[in-house]
Amino acid sequence: MIKIRDLEYYNNLKLDIYLPDSDTFDLLIYFHGGGLESGGKEEIIPSSDYLVERNIAIISINYRLYPFAKYPDFILDAVKGVKWCIENINKYGECKDIYIGGTSAGAYITQMLCFNSYYYKKENIDPLKIKGYIHDAGQPTVHFNVLKENGIDSRRIIINEDAPLYYVGIEKEYPRMLFIVSTNDLENRYEQTMLMLRTLKHFNYDESKIELKVMEGKHCEYVSKVIDNESVFGKIIYEFIKEKEP
């Protein structure tokens, strides 16, 4: 595995690259969690060996965080990162397919990118370049810290232009998607994930492209877990990318 750390992709923001030895690979672009106020690109490290050994390259991207960010800075940073990946990945080998994944706050970002095409259009990115999305325990309603920024009780469940759910039904089709949530997730996260899935069904999106994985335990605790020398989260990602293709 080749590791390239702390490459600047935009305005002093950094990313890390993990490359397999092969010249041809799939790519996972990853956004970390942390409530839009903490965390970092190193979050993917427990899964990196598992994925790279199976010929999946990873680019893990930092983005601006509260209190230095305001909505939608983190989404604008994320799409800049995606653009950098699309424009530069073939310098490191032949990239077959590109997937975007995120955990918790990172999955709020992945859902905003997936469902609100404004961000891709702003950067002249063709959404069809993205083969699939991994939305790991992300909030499909307005993120609780975006509510807090606006002086609203962070427990409120609000769907407006700041929520991924608001945009479902606008596009005619979406790429494949994997949603992950836990049985003992954050308060209301399981129910909100189910609402997202039912909304996609309500608009008659191809259910064969939508997968749900419910994990036993607490919010995202599987992300760093290793069982029998295998990364639990890495295996979930691998199976979605490599073994579940229609």
Model-derived segments and their meaning:
Residues 127, 132, 138-146, 157-194:
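The feature captures the conserved acid-bearing segment of alpha/beta-hydrolase catalytic domains
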Residues 203-246:
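C-terminal catalytic histidine-bearing segment of alpha/beta-hydrolase fold enzymes
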Residues 42-59:
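Short amphipathic alpha-helix adjacent to the substrate-entry channel of hydrolases
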Residues 151-157, 183-210:
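Active-site-adjacent alpha-helix of alpha/beta-hydrolase-fold enzymes
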Residues 70-89:
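Alpha/beta-hydrolase active-site loop
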